[in-house]
């Protein structure tokens, strides 16, 4: 007897309630979801939810996304991270800081595209 496929656990770190709502509505049947609105909540969820993928908004109310990404890399270096931001100029900054991430989406983007990127992570 084959075991059922386990849904991928995705942690969305996003401070905008409307976007969290959109993510939840669009992806709730596709992934096991958890959410954080601040960097502090993100670290809590990183431990509690043990996500397979992290979707990280770079602008948060309590921390800089780069600092949070650095902390994530210290705690979970293997965790795939997709960065989302409205700032077009963030990618070069992240590359210079040598903080690896697996993808970059500039807001606004299509949720379908985000799902395709998550699925492509393997």
Q: Across the structure, where does each feature detected by a protein language model lie?
A:
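Acidic catalytic/metal-coordinating carboxylates
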Residues: 38, 64-67
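Conserved acidic carboxylate
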Residues: 14
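C-terminal output helix
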Residues: 109-119
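Acidic, metal-coordinating helix/loop segments flanking the phosphotransfer/catalytic sites
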Residues: 35-53, 74
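Alpha4 helix (beta4-alpha4-beta5 surface) of REC/receiver domains from two-component response regulators
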Residues: 67, 88-105, 116
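Two-component/phosphorelay signaling modules centered on CheY-like receiver
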Residues: 17-34
């Amino acid at each position: 007897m084959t075991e059922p496929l386990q849904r991928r656990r995705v942690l969305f770190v996003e401070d905008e309630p409307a976007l969290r709502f959109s993510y939840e509505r669009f992806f709730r049947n596709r992934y096991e979801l958890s959410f954080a609105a601040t960097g502090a909540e993100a670290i809590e969820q990183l431990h509690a939810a043990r996500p397979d993928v992290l979707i990280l908004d770079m602008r948060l109310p309590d921390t800089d996304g780069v600092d949070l990404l650095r902390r994530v890399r210290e705690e979970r270096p293997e965790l795939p991270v997709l960065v989302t931001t409205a700032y077009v100029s963030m990618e070069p900054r992240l590359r210079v800081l040598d903080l690896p991430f697996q993808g970059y989406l500039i807001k606004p983007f299509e949720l379908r595209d985000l799902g395709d990127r998550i699925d492509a992570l393997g």
